[in-house]
């Protein structure tokens, strides 16, 4: 194989992101900092309130008054929410904080997701994704990225994360062992990603930062693991 072919083979597949739908803004909220999906509803972290909405109707079904200035995750029973330098474990029925652990970035964390019994925490400017013990906050391992990390999600064994630098933003699939970029979905210019979660099927939900919106983005079918 020639070096040119080798270079082409290693380049990630790049697609224009297909935005299926936009939701929000939500009430008086002007920001979306984190997003998760509980199997039925999408949750958006808007700074002082977690807002749950039905992705079919777009209607808000619940709000929780909790600090929520970065990533959000759901483990099947509880919500995990970054609040400054900590990660709170929250009862979604009541909003009660059941436990807290230190966030690895000490206030500079962004994305958050749950997979394989661990929390996965994005560190924005450090361009890192940490696997974190949800009981203690200890960092189990770290994956390096080459872009600012603004959201993290796992789906079907694939690790995806959002990026946002200046007016450019994308959703990218990376190799969880090496951090190599395997695939990129380029968002329209100015449509930043602040929080990312998969619905476990065909869609990503991406926070839209200061737009106050959440965008549903089609997950590509190419390259999926079976």
Predicted regions and their residues:
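A short helix->beta-strand "capping" segment at the edge of beta-propeller domains
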Residues: 7-29
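A short beta-strand motif characteristic of beta-propeller blades
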Residues: 18-26, 59-64, 96-102, 138-143, ...
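Beta-rich, blade/repeat-based domains predominating
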Residues: 26-39, 66-76, 104-116, 146-157, ...
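Conserved beta-strand positions in repeat-built beta-propeller and related beta-rich domains
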Residues: 42-48, 79-85, 121-126, 161-166, ...
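Beta-propeller domains
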Residues: 47-55
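WD40 beta-propeller blade core
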Residues: 51-52, 88, 130, 172, ...
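Short loop/turn segments that connect beta-strands within beta-propeller blades
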Residues: 54-58, 91-95, 133-137, 175-179, ...
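Blade-level signature of beta-propeller repeat domains, shared across WD40, Kelch, NHL, RCC1
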Residues: 193-226
